[in-house]
A protein has these predicted regions:
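Surface-exposed amphipathic alpha-helices with a cationic face
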Residues: 118-126, 175, 195-199
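Conserved Lys-Pro-Asp/Glu-containing loop-to-beta segment of HAD-superfamily phosphomonoesterases
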Residues: 34, 168-195
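Acidic, Mg2+-coordinating phosphoryl-transfer loop and its flanking beta/alpha structural elements
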Residues: 187-228
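Non-catalytic pre-domain segments flanking phosphatase-related domains
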Residues: 1-37
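Conserved H-loop
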Residues: 64, 89, 151-156, 181, ...
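Short, acidic loop-to-helix structural element flanking the phosphoryl-transfer center
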Residues: 106-133, 139-143, 168-169
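A short, structured active-site edge motif that brings together acidic residues
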Residues: 70-71, 152-165
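N-terminal helical cap/lid subdomain that shapes the substrate entry/recognition surface
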Residues: 30-118, 125
Length: 240
């Protein structure tokens, strides 16, 4: 069984300068002390490359390839429905993720940020005490990507779980590390499993609709926020 990481509070030069810069800004109405983001599909536009890698590995695992014409259909499926549709046995998932993320490392620095996220992340960082990432990708891939886009130093931590359903325990561990009440932390993700993990952990969730799962499927799970474009994050800075 995978255990949540023993996170350490960290401070970076950018984090300190961000907090100092906050003194020159109007008082923030942000109610969250910590923001935690999913990576693939939320911050990084990795979905096309992920599909390419998945299709390369599919013959080795005896599973279905994902054709371009069915991508939109897959956006409406839950994790269980997706695994069933692609004929992926749950026991093969950890190996598939490990091999896939290893291959992804070779192209991660060439991939794009979600358009508009750089400015939004930089602005949000000013208004919170801590900023992090919780992902099923590897910390090494995330680190390389963020450094390539000049954003690594605004993040205090990168947490990773190789289990597709393991994020709930990690969210609880992050909350404990930073001594937060549940309502003081927000997780941001693009998948149904992100919404469900946050709800299981009792932590507010913002679902973004530009990633893997569709707006319709995300809305059905009743997240606390739904954002259709990065600038919608600015709603967090307005009085509630």
């Amino acid at each position: 069984m995978e255990k949540p990481p023993a996170l350490k509070k960290t401070s970076t030069p950018t984090s300190r300068s961000s907090k100092a810069h906050a003194k020159d800004k109007p008082a923030s109405t942000m109610k969250f002390r910590t923001l935690v983001f999913d990576f693939d599909g939320t911050i990084a536009d990795t979905l096309g490359e992920t599909r390419k890698i998945f299709n390369e590995l599919a013959p080795d695992y005896g599973i279905r390839r994902v054709d371009e014409h069915e991508v939109e259909k897959l956006r409406h499926l839950s994790l269980k429905q997706l695994l069933d549709h692609l004929e992926i046995p749950k026991r093969r998932v950890p190996s598939l993720i490990a091999r896939g993320t290893s291959i992804l490392r070779g192209s991660i620095t060439r991939l794009d940020l979600i358009q508009g996220m750089s400015e939004v992340l930089t602005e949000l960082r000013v208004h919170v005490e801590s900023f992090g990432i919780l992902t099923s990708n590897t910390p090494e891939n995330v680190d390389l990507f963020l450094r390539g886009h000049g954003l690594r130093e605004i993040f205090d931590f990168i947490s990773s779980t190789s289990k597709l359903t393991g994020k709930s325990k990690h969210l609880k561990a992050i909350r404990k590390t930073f001594s937060l009440r549940a309502e003081e932390m927000l997780y941001v993700g693009d998948e149904l499993r992100d919404v469900k993990a946050s709800q299981k952990a009792g932590i507010p969730i913002a679902a973004v609709t530009w990633g893997f799962n569709s707006r319709e499927s995300l809305a059905a799970e009743k997240p606390d926020f739904i954002f259709d474009q990065p600038k919608d994050f600015m709603r967090l800075l307005k009085p509630h």
